[in-house]
């Protein structure tokens, strides 16, 4: 680290433990934007810490080759003042009201993979911030960036058809945490951690007082999540079953011609959702998943319960991990909705022995191996889990895990840039599949199929694919789901699969407003 790097001061305070992170989030954040809740389902696992961004120092968003930096406090403003002194002349800087806009050079998309990967890009906005400050105590979350990479971010790096979007979702949207709350369910502890990026004594006093205020609030009885009832919840879609089935059949013809091997078309479902946090609480209870998230932005709210990791990276071991999911069946239930264990096991057996499902799954495992081959040390890739079954409230999936060791000179953001978007949401070959998806879906995907999670200044990254999720704008929900199409797919089954995948979120929203 350069001697000129600015030190980060960490302020920590223990607070009363509460077992329900959703209630805590509601109590502390209410409807404030630039707040985030990230959690996992299994409290027995070591990694089952719930992390909340209570206050953000800065909002960092991107569209095309521009990055917008919006300071949200004096603490965040200090970061901008420091950045302006060190920014490369290759990056243009503009000031618009309280925002600072960084314009990066367009990436030459016909470059080879490595040259493209090392080209100056919008990801360098994060690298600049990280390199400017020094984490002397090596605290794991001194600089904690939490937020969303949208599916459409790929258009910065690859040539894809230009599409219109009817949502305000940026290519990426992240918050640099000023105050974090970390719940540890094993130890039953609650830690308030604040990061100070300035030597301003008044700002330090404000942040210390804010920590005391949060602790005092957690000593109080937690506010209940408000309820909003809706008499009639009308579910609509941008494609009916026939239209979606027709797209599947057209794509199958391209598979038969050999243009692609597999592709994942999707459709959107719409329904009112004036109370997203209540719907999220219902979704957690009905469909607990490895990754659960609730993000409140100035433009949207995003929540979900995702079964699938996008990309995970541990800087200490330099191990990078992908978790392809492909192969889906509904859970075995009786007519009254109760789980039938015998039927459930027979459905699992049928899925495990289905040639189409196995072919599709192994194709995506191979695609994950290829993704890692570009960025990992030769000979370091391996499949640690192959074709096992994960179960959720409405569906079960075939899953595998692929691991490799990241090459020297690359970081977690290089890895994400190389691997996006995940093959289980695109197809194979990946770029060709994404081009066809754009051609047939005809609009931006936004958050769907991108990734949500966090990365830190120490280099660690943990994200999940944004599926089984609800994107809410102006009290209205966009719930998107797709199906993996191969040569011998049955269109009617794939149409039903897309609805089965969307059902958990749809039911949660309905139950929250009943």
Curated annotation (Swiss-Prot):
Which residues are recorded as binding L-tryptophan? 40, 290-292
Q: InterPro entries from the entry?
A: ADC_synthase, Anth_synth_I-like, Anth_synth_I_N, Anth_synth_I_TrpE, Chorismate_C
Identify the residues that bind Mg(2+): 360, 497
A molecular function (GO) term: anthranilate synthase activity
The record lists the catalysed reaction(s) as: chorismate + L-glutamine = anthranilate + pyruvate + L-glutamate + H(+)
Signal peptide feature range: none
Q: Which Gene3D superfamilies match?
A: Anthranilate synthase
Ordered alphabetically, the record's keywords are:
Amino-acid biosynthesis, Aromatic amino acid biosynthesis, Lyase, Magnesium, Metal-binding, Plasmid, Tryptophan biosynthesis
Domain of life, per the record? Answer: Bacteria
Concerning Pfam families, the annotation shows: Anth_synt_I_N, Chorismate_bind
Residues where chorismate binds: 327-328, 448, 468, 482-484
Query: What is stated about the way this protein's activity is regulated?
Result: Feedback inhibited by tryptophan.
Cofactor: bound how, per the entry note?
Binds 1 Mg(2+) ion per subunit.
Function field: Part of a heterotetrameric complex that catalyzes the two-step biosynthesis of anthranilate, an intermediate in the biosynthesis of L-tryptophan. In the first step, the glutamine-binding beta subunit (TrpG) of anthranilate synthase (AS) provides the glutamine amidotransferase activity which generates ammonia as a substrate that, along with chorismate, is used in the second step, catalyzed by the large alpha subunit of AS (TrpE) to produce anthranilate. In the absence of TrpG, TrpE can synthesize anthranilate directly from chorismate and high concentrations of ammonia.
Give the similarity note: Belongs to the anthranilate synthase component I family.
Q: What name does the UniProt record give this protein?
A: Anthranilate synthase component 1
Q: Which organism is it from?
A: Buchnera aphidicola subsp. Rhopalosiphum padi
Q: What is the lineage of its organism?
A: Bacteria, Pseudomonadati, Pseudomonadota, Gammaproteobacteria, Enterobacterales
